[in-house]
């Protein structure tokens, strides 16, 4: 029997809708990504974090992929304010955390500091090029960081995905109700095609259940929109997966595109949701050619199994082999690449937007139909909206 222990040993809960807001005399405006982070800290998804990073923890995370106490943590979770706003704030202040006029939380300010963004970019993203979407977001943010413990006082409106939002305490309860002792998490910002289905089902052979946890926070403009992806996941699970072995729930964080570091981060978060295993494929959380194909797998070697507390499952690039007449990878298929059905994400998106159905050896026809319909509807609406 295997049981997932929250990262750091305790599932953090910073939710208090009755917090006395009149104690918070200052105000900080959040970005959409910071709002997501606030809620994920508050609900324990980012355990052991209890707030936005202070300089001591920030420096440790950027330089060592650990918090100052040595706990594995690879992505800096920060709250940025302008120089003008920073002049209004002082250590010891309590500030309301506001998004579009609504107060979602309070921070007890423990630190105000100016990060070295170039250093953060080079160490976290492995580049300081503004062409990298994560780096661009980093440099677009204000130049001062505010650290301190938070209290979550209001939950965000989950909209059309409301029935798929689950806090870590809820997923842990669900997995226990299902009788799942071992659960594998799968992170994605893309539709699930045959290659993803193959590695998920390979993982399902050795665990009790699959937690399909697609990211629905901020992504790149050319990524498939979340609403279309969610419909495609549902039709795939309905037609091709055992219903008692899979659980679908969304992950509201913004995409960082930090490649290897984000793979560690995604694993730690799924550990908090109750997963005992986590799938790491090729170029996990990558973008462009900034990371090596399997860098996101190699980075796990920097930590012991005990430090991670979740078992990464590494998979090589998968494809349909016409000679094997089935899904395979370079580990299991001896045939030449000319027998492999491989399409780039860019090529597939182009086909779908043009109404072309990818081969069934690449994508399930039901999934392709949903994606084509959704993208074409989006295209007809988009020109008038631009």
Curated annotation (Swiss-Prot):
Gene name of this polypeptide: sat
Secretion signal, residue range per the UniProt entry: none
HAMAP family: Sulf_adenylyltr (MF_00066)
UniProt name for this protein: Sulfate adenylyltransferase
Keyword Hydrolase: no
Superkingdom per UniProt: Bacteria
Annotated GO biological process: hydrogen sulfide biosynthetic process; sulfate assimilation
EC number annotated for this UniProt entry: 2.7.7.4
Organism field: Geobacillus kaustophilus (strain HTA426)
UniProt family annotation: Belongs to the sulfate adenylyltransferase family.
Reactions mediated catalytically: sulfate + ATP + H(+) = adenosine 5'-phosphosulfate + diphosphate
